[in-house]
Amino acid sequence: MRKNLHSNIVKSIIGIALLAFLSSCNSDPLGTTEPPVDTYNPIEYSPGSADFSNYVAIGNSLTAGFVDGALYNLGQQKSIPALLAGQLRAAGGQAVFNQPSVNSDYGCSNPGSGCTLGKYKLDADIPGPSPTLLGDPITAYAGDKTALHNFGVPGIQVGQLLTPETGIPGAAAFNPYYARFASSPGTSTILGDVLSRNPSFFTLWIGNNDVLGYATSGATNEAIFTDPAAFRARFEIVVGQLMGQTDAEGIVVDIPPILYAPYFQAVPYNPVVFDPESDADMGLVSLLNANFSGFNAALAGLQGIGQLTAADVEERKIQYTAGPNPVLIQDLNLEDLSSKFDVLATFGAITDEQRAALQPYVQARPIKQGEIITLPAGGVIGTLADPNNPTSVLGVALPLPAQFALAAADIQRIEQRRGELNAIIADVAGDYSSRIAFYNTNDPNGTFADLFGIDGSAPGIEFGGQFLNADFSPFGLFSTDGIHPNPRGAAIVANEMLDLIESSFSATLPRVNVLSLPTVALCTGQGAASDCASRVAGL
């Protein structure tokens, strides 16, 4: 059963068609080239009313160039601000866009465990995205900290732009990616360092992590789910200081529809598949249903004494069938049935042994279509909670822990909070509309709606005659972490910003050639460095 489950999850995450099509780590499977330049009718680029001579970028991982679960050379070189700065250069932008380079081809995907692992990759021999075995430590930036233009710091929330604690090891707000380039670790702030550069133009994309961290935790970490009132106070300070202490103009970006990213979409709700033609699988179905008959009977008993409704019982009942089945999850939104099961034991309806066996299921139910299994769950479903107990299969015999799923109530809370924070971002940006252009990533007719199929179309977008997917395949726009765009996705966002700059500041600017940039590579050989480095080569 475990092999069958894992096999089906692999199919959903990587895509069998891609494995058949690609035989090596080709960084550009589409075979695209730069478009020809019209040398007879050259375009005259212009900044319009804007001044791009000192462009700085402020934000989180999306600004820093964090891709594939790590901050490494390729992601920084092809970050959204770097691509944007390259085009602004044609209209008076600075000749060099300085970023706090990590000087690493692999980066670090497990900073809490000593950086033993690097960026994530797709490997034909390993189910789903997996890290390289070559992680590099996060070291201090060796360049000139006073000359930086990219102030993107992976993982930060809006409040971390304002506190010196972001650079203090051991502090609640500490972030090693800021500490490495802070002008004065322990006393400086990210925003203070930005203001010291006296920018003439800026991009500000902050707020994602004020919602995203809660979502990736399976709605289990309330402490990182920023309250709207606190968010407004902090965001107003950030924008107010940019407006009050500089003459800069710029772009403010809101929080995109994060739950449509592949991190929340790649693993289906029903990957537990039993083959109706397999006697072994059908035997497992019978065994599972026999084992859960006692749990289902206990639910019926609680209904019989008025402790549960018929709808409660139907929602929690566990029954497996041939074909695809939903994952069994822990849902912390459900009433904990511990005390009610205790009542059954007290009155002799169940034995003490039966009562103990019910404990793992006091907040368990099969997940429903439309609810979310997160990407990390793909490596957990079908594994054993207890290696010494072959019946402890997570997501099947035991509920998948809450941090790997989002129930409907969780999704509703996340979307409501995202909407509240986006309203604040739009409101504050609107207060300075003469100097700030607002990039609404939630425009129902915009690129994000098109990419994710929110507008009713099929997910994905057509660009330059090629169809690009909302996934982390070699034909996708996301990196292998399922959250951050790959270089092609970054280029599309940069071009969206260029469109906005033109319309808001009467500029005329070139665009990034999306299809000339590398995409996700399919690696072989257990992630050998020589294979997985191919995407970097030749840039």
Task: Annotate the PLM regions.
Residues 196-197, 234-252, 417-440:
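A structural motif corresponding to the C-terminal end of an alpha-helix
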Residues 58-61, 204-209, 215-217, 253-257, ...:
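Active-site-proximal beta-strand/loop segments in catalytic clefts of secreted hydrolases
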Residues 53-69:
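Catalytic nucleophile-elbow at a beta strand-turn-alpha helix junction centered on a G-D-S/GDSL motif
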Residues 2, 19-51, 507-524:
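Bacterial Sec-dependent N-terminal signal peptides
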Residues 2-13:
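Bacterial N-terminal signal peptides that target proteins for export
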Residues 71-237, 259, 264, 348, ...:
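Conserved SGNH/GDSL esterase-like catalytic core that processes O-acyl groups on lipids
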Residues 84, 466-520:
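Histidine-centered active-site loop/cap adjacent to the catalytic His
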Residues 265-416, 426-483:
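Mobile gating loops/cap/lid regions near enzyme active sites that modulate substrate access
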